[in-house]
Design a protein with these regions (language model features):
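C-terminal non-catalytic interaction modules
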Residues: 1-102, 359-412
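Basic/polar, acidic-poor N-terminal "presequence/leader" segments
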Residues: 90-122
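Conserved binding/catalytic microenvironments
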Residues: 115-412
Length: 412
């Protein structure tokens, strides 16, 4: 059973059950920020205009908070000719522009006017699976092209398919917009990612799929986290955990996975707002959830397990300024079977830990290995840290300057 089929098999919750979930006193408090209530109230996607502009992708913030050294100083050190400018930045920017344009197009209006044709559910399911895989792999140009073909068909399908297939069409729509949101966050486009996450939650609600709606909540919380809106991220995660409690207590693997991911997100928020006891408390809770999940497979977002808890512990320790704990935690992780992208993200955090100790050579070596393993996953983290490392030593090491050129951190 693939991810789409599992989600569809798990979806059926009656309208009264959904109303009961939403009637929890914590969910009904008027003072809480509740983006899902905006969906239920049928508020337009233009509500994102109330978010303050983000000046810099959060993925590019450094671990220590020190300002980046002007990258022109790297070139002035006599090393500016080493290597070629980073090859990925232009492609990533064009992909971001493409995804933003897709969200701006009036697919739903065209479908309402009968100007779009709906492919079969089987065809839509296959394309949605491919879109989800492209988003996970970071193949943003292909993802943009695939979504450009998929979204008009999905918007037409939810309006034209027989009633018995409507829930399937809405679920596929939710999954497609979730993939779009995840990609936009990786590309440093938080406001567009918010729009996509909002549409994903609206579609999941129409489908009656609690788990898919919760996955949309997780995606929205991640948008706020990466945008530095920590109070909003934590509130979404906290109230989503309340809603998922019943299913998780029954041992549903998807509910456990979502609770684990949301708990790790709260740990990250606590670390970035300088609450170490709270952060490590959430990590302890996440370990318990991972032990309950054990080896069972969960198909919902996010991926979760004991290894993810260990990786977040490293990042949390760096965010709290505890480089020694971060490096001890990293040394205890079994990386033998770890996917390249995940290992690259861990190595960026290891480099951040070494930077806290001002160990430039070790940090540079970790960054270089991360970029070699998975350039798309490591580039932003490396870009953010290079200037900080360069400011620690004059002139900067040759390997660091070469790495700067590789990731596009030198002026052309």
């Amino acid at each position: 059973m693939n991810a789409v089929e599992y989600q569809q098999a798990a979806r059926r919750r009656t309208a009264s059950e959904r109303r009961r979930d939403l009637s929890h006193p914590d969910l009904a408090r008027p003072d809480l920020v509740r983006p899902d209530l905006a969906v239920l109230a049928d508020r337009p996607a233009a509500w994102v205009a109330h978010v303050p502009p983000i000046e810099e992708p959060a993925a590019r913030r450094t671990g220590t908070g020190a300002p980046d050294m002007p990258l022109s100083k790297l070139a002035a050190a006599g090393q500016g000719e080493i290597g070629e400018p980073g090859v990925g930045e232009q492609g990533r920017s064009s992909a971001a522009d493409g995804l933003r344009l897709l969200l701006a197009r009036a697919h739903s209006l065209s479908a309402m006017l009968g100007e779009s044709c709906a492919p079969s559910i089987h065809s839509l399911r296959a394309t949605t699976e491919r879109v989800a895989a492209l988003a996970r792999a970071g193949e943003f140009e292909e993802l943009t092209s695939a979504l450009g073909r998929l979204l008009p068909g999905l918007e037409a399908a939810v309006r034209t398919v027989p009633k018995e297939s409507q829930a399937d069409a809405y679920e596929l729509t939710a999954m497609a917009y979730q993939a779009c949101s995840a990609a936009l966050m990786k590309l440093g486009e938080p406001l567009a990612a918010w729009v996509a996450a909002d549409r994903a939650m609206a579609a999941a609600e129409q489908a009656g799929n609690l788990l898919l709606a919760a996955a949309g909540q997780y995606r929205l919380a991640a948008v706020f986290l990466d945008s530095g809106e920590y109070a909003l991220a934590d509130e979404i995660a906290r109230t989503s955990l309340i809603a998922l409690r019943g299913l998780a207590e029954l041992g549903d693997p998807d509910a456990l996975s979502l609770r684990g991911g949301l708990t790790l997100l709260r740990a990250t928020v606590a670390a970035r707002t300088d609450h170490p006891a709270t952060a490590f408390g959430h990590l302890a809770t996440a370990r318990l959830i991972a032990s309950r999940l054990a080896g069972r497979t969960a198909n919902e977002l996010p991926e979760f397990g004991a290894q993810y808890v260990a990786l977040v512990e490293i990042a949390v320790s760096v965010d709290l300024g505890d480089a020694d704990h971060a490096l001890r935690a990293a040394a205890a992780v079994d990386t033998a079977s770890m996917p390249a992208g995940r290992l690259a993200r861990m190595l960026v955090d290891v480099a951040r830990a070494y930077a806290l100790r001002q160990e430039v050579d070790q940090a540079t070596a970790a960054l270089a290995r991360a970029v070699d393993l998975e350039p798309a996953e490591a580039r932003d983290g490396a870009f953010a840290l290079i200037g900080e490392l360069a400011s620690m030593r004059t002139p900067p090491p040759r390997l660091l300057v070469a790495l700067a050129a590789q990731v596009g951190a030198l002026p052309p």
